């Protein structure tokens, strides 16, 4: 498996199923600004709320071939083997498909993941052990705490500024290397001092 990150903003996403797994997947898709359609006879209370707010569309029925047309990303989150088989038989080769109940039946896996601002971390054991995946996620989320939210934004702003400086490539590299020292994550004062230092190069 090759790990990539998808930009789902404005992209069509079809979620087949309306239970716990579907709800969890949808929550992430909403954060990414996807255009979501849910197809399921019944859906969770959260999905009902999102529909009421106009955040997604719900078709309360069994999935049909017409629902799969012109969809960028399909997530099948149901334990109904007949539904899973139907979707597998009718998808197109160029569609991205995640089968929650059987990784091998789709061409996309959705790893455990979390974000701290511009920092995104994803963990997968390729289906070997969801429990180990969960443990590693908990360990990483503890090590990479909320301080990284502000820190990664600082790094991004500095990178933009440094690349605009009229200095040598080696000096730019030195500056970029300097700010990944943990002292900058832990001190807003150090961050301000560095930005003031950058101003002197202009």
UniProtKB/Swiss-Prot annotation:
Its EC number is 1.3.1.76. Changing residue 98 to A: 4-fold decrease in the dehydrogenase activity. One of its GO terms (molecular function) is ferrochelatase activity. It catalyses: precorrin-2 + NAD(+) = sirohydrochlorin + NADH + 2 H(+). NCBIfam families: cysG_Nterm (TIGR01470), PRK06718.1 (NF005222). Belongs to the precorrin-2 dehydrogenase / sirohydrochlorin ferrochelatase family. Catalyzes the dehydrogenation of precorrin-2 to form sirohydrochlorin which is used as a precursor in both siroheme biosynthesis and in the anaerobic branch of adenosylcobalamin biosynthesis. It is unable to oxidize precorrin-3. Homodimer. This is Precorrin-2 dehydrogenase. It comes from Priestia megaterium (Bacillus megaterium). The lineage of its organism: Bacteria, Bacillati, Bacillota, Bacilli, Bacillales.
């Amino acid at each position: 498996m090759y790990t990539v990150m998808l930009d789902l903003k404005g992209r069509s996403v079809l979620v087949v199923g309306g239970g716990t797994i579907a709800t969890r997947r949808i929550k992430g898709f909403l954060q990414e600004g996807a255009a979501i359609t849910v197809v399921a006879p019944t859906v969770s209370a959260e999905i009902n709320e999102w529909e009421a707010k106009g955040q997604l569309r719900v078709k309360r029925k069994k999935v049909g071939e017409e629902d799969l047309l012109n969809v960028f990303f399909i997530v099948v989150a149901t334990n109904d083997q007949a539904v899973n088989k139907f979707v597998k038989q009718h998808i197109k080769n160029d569609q991205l498909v995640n089968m929650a109940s059987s990784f091998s039946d789709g061409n996309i896996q959705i790893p455990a993941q979390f974000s701290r601002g511009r920092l995104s971390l994803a963990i997968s054991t390729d289906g070997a052990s969801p429990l180990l995946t969960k443990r590693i996620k908990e360990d990483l989320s503890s090590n990479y705490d909320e301080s990284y939210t502000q820190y990664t934004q600082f790094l991004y702003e500095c990178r933009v500024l440094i690349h605009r400086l009229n200095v040598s490539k080696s000096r730019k590299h030195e500056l970029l290397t300097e700010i990944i020292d943990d002292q900058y994550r832990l001190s807003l004062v150090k961050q301000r001092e560095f930005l003031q230092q950058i101003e002197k190069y202009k």
